[in-house]
């Protein structure tokens, strides 16, 4: 079976990691082809897997009508040339243009939603545009199926009437397990870690304002890169917490960094089902996160971590203070999170559920045996 995967940007993010886990998890019965808008992290890693990688330069994130039309035409040509059995799109922009192109070529198409473009927290004009585009895509293409990475996203789509329930399936993100590298309680002073790109969505500002009121010794490690990095660094100096904060940049040793930390935080304004939280749970870390998107489907209040409202400086501070002050609490919540990861969010579970979605479109005889032994 041949699958064409389409995504807009190749940057290092949750959607890209999810896509790599899919492409690396299929047996030799699957031939994967990747189409993305530029060279970057994703194309480099895909080529290491032996994936046929195509750059479609017109496939860009900003809305540009002429360029978007060219991207649509380019994807149609690519579909005709590669003759995939399924087109599988990731991210909102690729999800719209890719579905249009696949349906025009009469190829079954899957769209994985890594958070809707009309999520709460996104600016009103973009929410309206995202909602209209999803209504449009749902109506022009009948031979499609939508994968939501969280039940919350599926419920939101039903509420907004963008897709019928029978055309959607929740497949939680899953990642490969790795051995615990070290005791999460080895740090002195304790290390708080956040792994996220420096974008408005991740709201590093709230986290910095929260730690400005914390007492005692601790370190905050911020892993990632992005356009707001310098702005966040300046805010850390303005708040007088720069000595507590380490900006580590984009890293390829995140499991090691998590193994040396004592607790994980994610202060996002909106999310789908964050892979970064799964990585923290895999490492046995308790999690403090904002209650957005599908976050509460992995962070169980008082069991695997604590939930706060978006932009709730005091709430983040209280949760961090409780965990910093109590090593036994960190161990209990982190251990429960680790067990939940093993039980529910492994890579194989994700692959099996994704294969079942493919089977709905092309038949079980085409998808039997496509999941590798992982």
Predicted segments with their positions:
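Membrane-proximal helix-turn-helix segments that form the acceptor-binding/catalytic region
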Residues: 73, 127-146
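Conserved acidic donor-binding segment of nucleotide-sugar-dependent glycosyltransferases
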Residues: 301-302, 306-313, 322-328
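A conserved mid-protein helix/loop that constitutes part of the nucleotide-sugar donor-binding site
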Residues: 13-21, 190, 194-213, 227-234, ...
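A short, well-ordered alpha-helix in the C-terminal region of glycosyltransferases
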Residues: 315, 322, 329-356
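A short, active-site helix/loop in glycosyltransferases that binds the activated sugar's phosphate group
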Residues: 140-167, 175
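Aromatic "clamp/platform" in nucleotide-sugar-dependent glycosyltransferases that forms part
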Residues: 250, 269
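Short hydrophobic beta-strand element within catalytic cores of glycosyltransferases
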Residues: 35, 286-289, 299
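N-terminal strand-loop element at the rim of the active site
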Residues: 5-67, 156, 167-170, 226-228
């Amino acid at each position: 079976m041949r699958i064409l995967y389409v995504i807009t940007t190749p940057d290092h993010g949750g959607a890209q990691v999810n896509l790599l886990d899919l492409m690396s998890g299929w047996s030799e019965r699957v031939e994967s082809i990747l189409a993305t808008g530029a060279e970057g992290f994703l194309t480099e890693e895909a080529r290491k897997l032996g994936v046929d990688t195509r750059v479609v330069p017109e496939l860009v994130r900003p809305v540009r009508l002429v360029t978007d039309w060219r991207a649509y035409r380019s994807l149609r040509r690519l579909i005709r040339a590669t003759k995939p059995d399924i087109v599988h799109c990731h991210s909102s922009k690729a999800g719209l243009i890719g579905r249009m192109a696949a349906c025009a070529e009469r190829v079954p198409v899957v769209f994985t939603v890594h958070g809707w473009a009309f999520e709460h927290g996104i600016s009103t004009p973009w929410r309206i545009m995202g909602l209209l585009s999803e209504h449009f895509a749902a109506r022009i293409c009948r031979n499609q199926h939508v994968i939501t990475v969280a039940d919350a996203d599926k419920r939101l789509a039903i509420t907004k009437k963008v897709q019928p329930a029978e055309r959607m399936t929740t497949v939680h993100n899953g990642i490969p397990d790795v051995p615990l590298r070290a005791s999460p309680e080895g740090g002195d002073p304790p290390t708080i870690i956040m792994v996220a790109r420096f974008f408005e969505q991740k709201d590093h500002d709230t986290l910095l304002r929260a730690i400005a009121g914390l007492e005692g010794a601790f370190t905050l490690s911020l892993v990632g890169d992005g356009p707001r990095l310098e702005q966040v660094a300046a805010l850390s100096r303005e708040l007088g917490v720069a000595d507590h904060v380490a900006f580590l940049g984009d890293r390829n040793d995140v499991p090691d960094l998590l193994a040396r930390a004592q607790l994980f935080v994610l202060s996002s304004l909106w999310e789908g089902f964050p892979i970064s939280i799964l990585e923290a749970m895999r490492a046995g870390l308790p999690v403090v996160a904002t209650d957005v998107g599908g976050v509460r489907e992995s962070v169980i209040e008082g069991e695997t971590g604590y939930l706060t409202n978006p932009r709730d400086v005091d709430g983040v501070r209280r949760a961090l203070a409780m965990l910093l002050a109590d090593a036994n609490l960190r161990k209990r919540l982190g251990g429960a999170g680790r067990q939940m990861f093993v039980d529910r969010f492994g890579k194989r579970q994700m692959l099996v559920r994704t294969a079942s979605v493919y089977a709905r479109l092309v038949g079980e005889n085409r998808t039997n045996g496509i999941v590798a032994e992982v």
